[in-house]
Amino acid sequence: MLSPTNSISKTVPAPPQDSSKPVLISEEPQNQLLQKVARTALAVLLVVVTLGLILLFYSFSDLQSFPWCCQTRPSTKEHPTISIPEPLPSPPLAVPRPSTPPPPVISRPSTPPAPTPAISPPSTPSAPKPSTPPPLPPKAPKPVKTQEDLLPFVPEQVFVEMYEDMARRQIIEALVPAWDSDIIFKCLCYFHTLYQGLIPLETFPPATIFNFKQKIISILEDKKAVLRGEPIKGSLPICCSEENYRRHLQGTTLLPVFMWYHPTPKTLSDTMQTMKQLAIKGSVGASHWLLVIVDIQARRLVYFDSLYNYVMSPEDMKKDLQSFAQQLDQVYPACDSQKFSVKIAAKEVIQKGSGSSCGAWCCQFLHWYLRDPFTDALNDLPVDSVERHENLASFVRACEAAVQDLPELFWPEAKALF
């Protein structure tokens, strides 16, 4: 039984729900969902706009250089936190150095490590293992030579001297012209009028280094025949009669033998062929006039080369002429048994700065010798080449003016001695 004082609780039944009406979502959760979607769309829009602005102001290569740009690089080590860039490797040594102690190993304990004792190097270096040879040092790049490096360095003073030498040569060539065989023969004819003892030997065809000895011997043989009253055996000159030639041989005491020389031909026939070719071209080329004076009265052979050693060295030429002088002593002996002597006239290059004045220099030296055969006029030559050729030019003008009145390529008439 229940006590009457206790209140009796009654349960009120719930009203019945209509099953035909749909269940609606509450308005508060719906508003939260819309806010999330709007914030997400706004964030995406801001990201897109930011990337678009970045693309407008930077190129693709600039984007790659940014530190946040993703670049995949192969890595052999895994770093737990931050990857530290490795330093550039130093070039390996060709030969290991055992004397250098290895670097101490640094450990990273929680407490400071004790100092590691230094390891003393071994007394003798250990040889590298044959299986692992030491790496070779990198080869240094070859220096690239430019066109300026290939050309030798020429000082400025050399160019100045070359310019002065060219100007000096032009002045000298304008002062003294080249003399051919015709002018030289006319000059000899003019000298004969001044010195009757000189015989004007023809210079065409001229003597050469291959036949000048035979020509001298032939003239001396003909002179002996004339003195004996015998007919001459040698060939007569082209522009001289036999009677006039005999008178010249009878009274001559000096033979001026002009030699034409070219360094290329090695025989007499080749020399004559080269002479013809240069005459057709109208050029002197490398030809050169030489002079051999046969002084019969003084018993002397005088050799003059204005280029000093163009044919051969003066020592070799003197030996050759001394041998020839012994031969002349037998061909044309003296009454008092005096022997022929040899003299090399030039002691240096006379025609400095000129390549075509050799013929004029030979005539100038012959003129000096005719005036005084015992005085060496070459010792009084000016040192300056221009001044030296100016003096030669005055001699050339005097000779050219004197030979104008002489007949063309005809021997002057010699006077009979008895």
From Swiss-Prot:
Query: What Gene Ontology molecular function terms does this protein carry?
Result: cysteine-type deubiquitinase activity; deNEDDylase activity
Which keywords does this Swiss-Prot/TrEMBL entry list? Hydrolase, Membrane, Protease, Secreted, Thiol protease, Transmembrane, Transmembrane helix, Ubl conjugation pathway, Virulence
TM helices/strands, residue ranges: 40-60
Where mainly found? Answer: secreted
Against InterPro entries, the record matches this protein to: Papain-like_cys_pep_sf, Peptidase_C48_C
* GO terms for cellular component: extracellular region; host cell; membrane
The record's Gene Ontology biological-process terms are: protein deneddylation; protein deubiquitination; proteolysis
Entry membrane topology: Single-pass membrane protein
Could you say which enzyme class this protein belongs to?
Answer: hydrolase
Which EC numbers does the record give? 3.4.22.-
| Catalytic residue positions | H288, D305, C358
Q: Where is the composition biased (Pro residues)?
A: 86-141
Q: Which cysteines are joined by disulfide bonds?
A: none
Q: According to the UniProt record, where is the region Disordered?
A: 1-23, 75-145
- Bias class Polar residues marks the residues at 1-10
Entry's family note? Belongs to the peptidase C48 family.
Protein name according to UniProt: Deubiquitinase and deneddylase Dub1
Query: Which gene is annotated as encoding this protein in its UniProt record?
Result: cdu1
